[in-house]
Structures are given as C-alpha cells and as structure tokens.
Amino acid sequence: MNLSLHEARIIGCLLEKEVTTPDQYPLSLNSLTLACNQKSSRDPVMSMTESETQSAIDSLMKKRLVTDQTGFGSRVTKYKHRFCNTEFSDLQFSPAQFALICLLLLRGPQTPGELKSRSGRLHQFADLNEVENALLALAQREPSLVHQLPKEPGRRDSRFEELISDQVKGESVPISEHSRSQREAPSKRQDEMDELTLRVSQLELEVKTLKEALQDLLD
C-alpha cells in the first residue's frame, strides 16, 4: 500500500478515534492534526502542521482511503477513513485485527504483550494466543500486512511491524518460530524455578528436623 509516514499516522488516528471517540468522529482538520501530534500513545511523536496534515489527507483522498463530509448547517469539513471495514474497502478486519493494525500504525513495532496491554480501548484480547493468532492472520494475507522482526538482544519477545507504510522495514523472520517457542521457554523456566524453590524448602525442612533430632540427642 506504501503509505507515507504522515499518511500512516492519519489512517491510524482515524481508526483509533472511530472506536474510542465515536461521538467526535469524523474529525476536522484541526482535530486530526491534534490527534496526529498526541504525546501519548504515539511513536514517534510528531509535530505536524495543519498544512502537512491537509497535504497528506489530499493524497489519501486520491488513493480513495479517506473521504470528506460536511455536516448539515456546518462549514467545517470533516474526514473519515475508507481504509478498512467499509463497503468501499478491500480490507475487512476482525475487531482483533483492526486493533492491531491501528496500534502498529500509531506506535511502530511492538511485541504481542505490548499490543495486548495497549489495546484496551480498541479491543479486549482474552490472552496472548488471540493476539498471536490475529497477527498470524494479518501476516498470511496476500500481500502480508505485518511481519515478525528478529528478536533483539536483551528482549524476551520478538516485535511485529506493519507493512502498510513505506518506512524502512526491518528483516523478517518466520512467525512460526515465534509463539510456542517464546511462550513455552519462560513457562519452562518458571516450572524449573518452582521445582527448585520446592526442593530448597524441602531441604530446609529436613535440616531443621535433623537439627531438632540432634538437639534431642545432646539433651
């Protein structure tokens, strides 16, 4: 799809506000610019001017991804997306997929855990499995809409990145390597720690019992 950085931010904001503030959607140029420049829930944080926002909107309208409307009795033009889940959209997403695409457009590459923790206002994921299944479905589309990045040093989990914007993308690795291996590894380590803790407790109890028995003999 090759959206520019500004275009991707605008689409992400329109997706977000459609769900989180439906009473204020569609958005005026001013409201959309403010949404693009939010300090929270944005990475990177931007400082787009209204002129830059309008230029990106115009480009998106030519791509038929955004449409404008003027309410009855109002001179203010407002904008809404046609990016997905409309009768004019090629892309149709489940609520889970919608939330993930929105978050990836607004906040860049993220781990499944980060996506789950940040998605509350968009979609309530039951668990990490639901996140991973939705990511896999998006990756298996033709063309793919997300991909998995190699695990970074110091990180327990791999991050996922959208493939909708034209920003430089990281190296991709097969998603099949992700879910089970990375979720089971911590679980295995936790099981080992629990077993070790139990053994230490048992040894402490045995030592205490031996000390008491020895003390009885000495007495």
Curated annotation (Swiss-Prot):
Bias (Basic and acidic residues) ranges: 177-191
Pfam families noted in UniProt: DUF480 (PF04337)
List every stretch annotated Disordered.
167-195
Q: Which cysteines are joined by disulfide bonds?
A: none
Where does the source fall among the domains of life? Bacteria
Q: Would you identify the family this protein belongs to, as annotated? A: Belongs to the UPF0502 family.
**HAMAP family given in the database record:** UPF0502 (MF_01584)
Q: What's this protein's name?
A: UPF0502 protein Swoo_2055
Q: Which organism is it from?
A: Shewanella woodyi (strain ATCC 51908 / MS32)
